[in-house]
Design a protein with these regions (language model features):
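Sec/Tat signal peptide C-region and signal peptidase I cleavage site
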Residues: 24-28
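Bacterial N-terminal signal peptides that target proteins for export
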Residues: 2-12
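A general, composition-driven signal for non-globular sequence regions
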Residues: 2, 19-23, 339, 370
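Protease-labile, long low-complexity intrinsically disordered regions enriched in Pro/Ser/Thr
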Residues: 29-393
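Bacterial N-terminal signal peptides
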Residues: 10-21
Length: 393
């Protein structure tokens, strides 16, 4: 009898050890790259803006930490007169593609954007309006890192804070090196999630065929913030606007947990959050959601040669909502800017700047509805002033 009990106890202990070992191995896979594999990991964002009643807006950013270093290549007008000021439904921002390998790998990448336009990229690539190709670059584990810098405080740089291998294009003297492949663009098709504000309820709807793994509703006003999480969205759901009494740090941990759960390594998730923290959690009301992989592959089909043994693509959708409160404050500021007073104009700029890049559609509508030409000119000048960096105003 005692032998049977002892045997059962031994088996139970061995099973517990085995489960713990498997759990730790699975956890470790999300913390750092696996050895002996050629892998590619990508993260990026899709940003859209809609009115409170859910109408998608054509928009261009007025302000915000989206400026890129001077060495980044751009379209030189192929997507309009300055991609930053070109109106679009969706802005595809900071996709970065990392590679992992134990030995040198010569590779090529092609990304298509059928319903959009590629606007910026680095390193040097063959870029046309709807496609971008990096041909014959080398993933070089252990190579001396000699990445370009321009002395700016661009949010581009935190994306380098990962264990990805350096990538080199061209020869050592005239070539370029970076920790990732970077590209950005503007799109003209709607995203799979719509948002609508009704009283204190946010109505979210998944129009796509696949489940959206996680949705985060975030709101911030006057320095106070709150958030709510909705899991596994299919069809339509309603989320109450949060009380603005929650600290940000728990949300940052939830964000990192979400990104790692989708396949990013911990350092990649941390780099993404560091890149976007200032912009993601500014004043306003917005919905974040994990783009279904099928939607990402449809919007941005990608080809990598040689084919990696692992390809992870994690895109965060950001749906900005123009609330009635936000619209009222911006319109009041627009009227204030029409007064012939430097003090009034400074107040208008400070009011609108709180809403970062997303005041554009409200100001554009105010300009269209202005009663006289002088008001239209004043609002247009306000928009131009807001488009400048803060230190040049």
């Amino acid at each position: 009898m005692f032998k049977r009990i002892s045997l059962r106890f031994t088996i139970a202990v061995l099973l517990a050890i085995l489960c713990a070992s498997l759990s730790s191995k699975l956890e470790a896979q999300n913390q750092s790259p696996r050895q002996g594999r050629f892998a590619a990991h990508e993260w990026g964002t899709f940003t859209s803006v809609s009115t409170a009643n859910g109408i998608p807006q054509m928009w261009s950013p007025l302000t915000g930490p989206s400026e890129l270093p001077s060495f980044v290549y751009h379209t030189s007008g192929r997507c309009g007169k300055g991609s930053q000021r070109t109106l679009a439904l969706v802005r595809m921002e900071t996709p970065v593609l990392y590679f992992y390998s134990d030995s040198n790998v010569r590779a090529s990448v092609k990304v298509a954007f059928p319903k959009g336009c590629i606007t910026e990229w680095y390193p040097l690539a063959r870029a046309e309006s709807q496609t971008i190709e990096w041909n014959d670059f080398v993933a070089q584990p252990g190579a001396r890192e000699n990445f370009p810098v321009d002395g700016s405080r661009s949010h581009y740089y935190p994306a380098r804070e990962t264990d990805a291998v350096p990538l080199s294009l061209g020869d050592e003297q005239k070539g370029e090196q970076e920790k990732f492949l970077f590209y950005r663009g503007i799109g003209f098709s709607e995203v799979p999630l719509s948002v609508k504000l009704k009283d204190d309820q946010v109505i979210i709807r998944n129009y796509g065929p696949d489940e959206i793994a996680r949705v985060i509703l975030f709101e911030k006003h006057g320095g106070k913030s709150g958030w709510r999480i909705h899991e596994a969205l299919k069809g339509e759901s309603t989320i109450a606007r949060p009380a603005l009494d929650q600290p940000l740090e728990p949300l940052l941990r939830e964000f990192e947990k979400t990104l790692v759960g989708q396949g990013l390594y911990e350092k990649e998730a941390a780099a993404m959050i560091k890149t976007w923290r200032d912009s993601w959690f500014e004043e306003g009301l917005r919905v974040f959601y994990i783009m279904p992989r099928s939607a990402t592959d449809t919007i941005l089909p990608i080809t990598i040669k040689p084919q990696p043994q692992e390809l992870v693509r994690v895109f965060v959708g950001r749906a900005e909502i123009i609330t009635p409160e936000m619209e009222k404050q911006i319109l009041t500021a627009a009227q204030l800017s029409c007064e012939n007073s430097p003090e009034a104009r400074a107040t208008a700029i400070n009011t609108v700047r709180r809403y970062g890049r997303f005041a554009d559609p409200v100001l554009r509508e105010a300009m269209n509805n202005a009663k006289d030409e002088a008001s239209r000119v004043s609002i247009n000048e306000l928009m131009k002033e807001l488009a400048k960096p803060a230190d040049r105003q």
